[in-house]
């Protein structure tokens, strides 16, 4: 394996939702919603351009229930179903990943975070630098000097110091903070009334959950001590929920993952996919990218109907348009 190649782990499921909620509704000519597909596609293109010499895999959550629901049946029970216009986009996004010939993986019974933790451990054992493409706080427990995170929306890297500033403890101690504070979004109980600041103080004083409960007599605040005593079972359950599994049986090894530079000759599927979705701006941008568009025939994206527009190229026409907008009371602008 090329020692210079890094491992790029893309948290696909998390980014789908960020793309969906971060972009306005968009539809294909046939009415299929594609705003999340559009955002995801452009994120993937940016990653390929930036990390073409590195090994990349996109990881998704499988079914909603996993081994954590056996530990705590109420885990994530408060989450509703995905929006109706997002559901049909899941399969299209998987088509997108396939069109770029990037490997993708999901395993029944586990969350994407567990697979990311497993790959990160394997990479660490083989001295391979790892980049986790996600801003999910649950993954920050994995950060080391050799494992960083990348927030694709902000194009910001998250390292050890960033995690320490956020939680007040080392990355490997983040799980203790989460066990104490709980998580309303994921329905993780924690200890009621224990916030991040207090949790940070406790872990800095006692190192971990076991150390904390062995030294409850050293906690001067009676109310705090009683809360911890009463919620010990919930705290220990929460610790099991937030700790990521790093030993999932994965058939696709790091050595089996190729860099994009090695697979770019399979890129005809990319342009076929972009045409099918009507992503004209992305199509044109990639067509001019010699690295991605190697030997691609220039087939224009077919339009469903003839263009119908008014060209505004003088002040009078502009004023007429403004008057029309005032009459209607609403104006939509497409900046693609």
Task: Enumerate the predicted regions with their spans.
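Structured, non-catalytic alpha/beta "coupling" segments that mediate domain-domain communication
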Residues: 48-59, 129-141, 145, 230-246, ...
């Amino acid at each position: 394996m090329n020692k210079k190649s890094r491992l790029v782990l893309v948290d696909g499921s998390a980014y789908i939702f960020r793309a969906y909620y971060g972009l306005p509704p968009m539809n294909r000519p046939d009415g299929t919603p594609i705003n999340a597909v559009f955002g995801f596609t452009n994120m993937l293109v940016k990653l390929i351009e930036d990390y073409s010499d590195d090994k990349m895999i996109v990881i998704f959550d499988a079914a909603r229930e996993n081994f954590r629901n056996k530990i705590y049946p109420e885990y994530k029970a408060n989450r509703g179903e995905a929006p109706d216009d997002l559901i049909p986009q899941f399969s299209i996004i998987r088509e997108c990943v396939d069109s770029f010939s990037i490997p993708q993986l999901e395993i029944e019974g586990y969350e994407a975070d567990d697979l990311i933790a497993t790959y990160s451990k394997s990479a660490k054992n083989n001295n391979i630098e790892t980049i986790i493409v996600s801003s999910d706080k649950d993954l920050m427990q994995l950060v080391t000097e050799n494992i960083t995170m990348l927030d694709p929306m902000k194009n910001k890297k998250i390292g050890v110091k960033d995690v320490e500033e956020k939680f007040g403890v080392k990355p490997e101690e983040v799980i203790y903070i989460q066990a104490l504070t709980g998580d309303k979004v994921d329905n993780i109980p924690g200890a009621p009334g224990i916030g991040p600041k207090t949790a940070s103080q406790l872990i800095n004083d006692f190192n971990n959950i076991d150390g904390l409960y062995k030294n409850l007599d050293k906690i001067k605040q009676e109310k705090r001590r009683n809360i911890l005593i009463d919620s010990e079972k919930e705290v220990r359950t929460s610790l099991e929920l937030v700790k990521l599994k790093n030993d999932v049986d994965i058939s696709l090894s790091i050595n089996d993952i190729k860099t994009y530079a090695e697979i770019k000759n399979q890129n005809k599927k990319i342009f076929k996919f972009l045409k099918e979705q009507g992503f004209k701006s992305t199509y044109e941008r990639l067509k001019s990218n010699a690295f991605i568009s190697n030997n691609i025939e220039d087939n224009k994206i077919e339009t469903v109907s003839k263009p119908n527009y008014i060209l505004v190229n003088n002040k009078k026409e502009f004023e007429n348009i403004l008057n029309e907008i005032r009459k209607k009371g609403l104006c939509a602008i497409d900046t693609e």
